[in-house]
């Protein structure tokens, strides 16, 4: 899991328009109180996974914080390593995730894990360098690094910003696959790259709908569902007095 935390941090930096080769990491680890070999094994295995990625990508972690007291009575926090990726980039090269223009194509720059489910580092490096190059050439105009919600989460959140419609067609098994390392991109032209798969296009935005495998979803309903979970804790509206 920690290996993919590092991968996700890199993917997010790339999707914003920066070069992953110049980035640095900071880690936040949070684990239960250490009491036996099993509990000690959780942070050890997580840090080994993160270190393996650092070595293979040739990138250092320059800071972080650990918390090893995530236990209250018989309740333990879920074991976690969170990776933050930082770098600098020319402001003119930075892009944002929301869909930009009707008629643009949507491609998935896909990462395929190794047989043991570990990241394919060589493929990731090639994919990220290609995406960075296409952003510099202003062919890729928006991008979203896939996370726990897969392609479904990515296309929904990309549609929220400008309310543009989109149509995508993908294997249903791929819709909610984690997809860490993969990036969904909006392209003004076309992509000629082995790991770039055409999955859809941006449409006019008049209906405020996403069409996924022929099924239509109202964008505003999706936005409400996305914010509902934390609305009581972090309300985004309030009554006027």
What are these regions (language model features)?
Residues 179-181:
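A structural-propensity feature for long, helix-poor, extended segments
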Residues 1-66, 70:
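A glycine-rich phosphate/pyrophosphate-binding beta-strand-loop-alpha-helix module
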Residues 185:
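Catalytic core of tubulin tyrosine ligase-like
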């Amino acid at each position: 899991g920690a290996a993919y935390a590092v991968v996700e941090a890199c993917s997010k930096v790339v999707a914003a328009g920066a070069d992953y080769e110049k980035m640095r990491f900071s880690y936040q680890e949070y684990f239960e109180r250490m009491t036996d070999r099993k509990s000690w094994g959780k942070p050890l295995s997580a840090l080994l996974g993160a270190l393996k990625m650092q070595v293979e990508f040739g990138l250092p972690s320059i800071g972080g914080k650990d918390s090893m007291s995530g236990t209250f009575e018989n309740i333990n926090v879920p074991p976690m390593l969170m990776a933050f990726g930082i770098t600098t980039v020319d402001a003119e090269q930075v892009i944002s995730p929301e869909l930009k223009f009707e008629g643009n194509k949507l491609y998935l720059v896909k990462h395929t894990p190794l047989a043991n489910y570990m990241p394919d580092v060589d493929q990731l490096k090639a994919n990220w360098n290609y995406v960075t190059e296409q952003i510099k050439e202003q062919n890729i105009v928006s991008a979203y690094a896939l996370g726990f919600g897969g392609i479904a989460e990515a296309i929904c959140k990309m549609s929220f910003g400008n309310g543009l419609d989109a149509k995508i067609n993908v294997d249903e098994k791929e819709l909610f696959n984690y997809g860490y390392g993969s990036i969904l991109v909006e392209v003004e032209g076309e992509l000629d790259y082995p790991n770039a798969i055409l999955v859809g296009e941006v449409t006019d935005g008049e209906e405020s709908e996403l069409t996924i495998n022929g099924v239509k979803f109202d964008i505003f309903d999706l936005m409400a569902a996305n914010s509902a979970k934390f609305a009581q804790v972090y309300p985004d509206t309030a009554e006027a007095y």
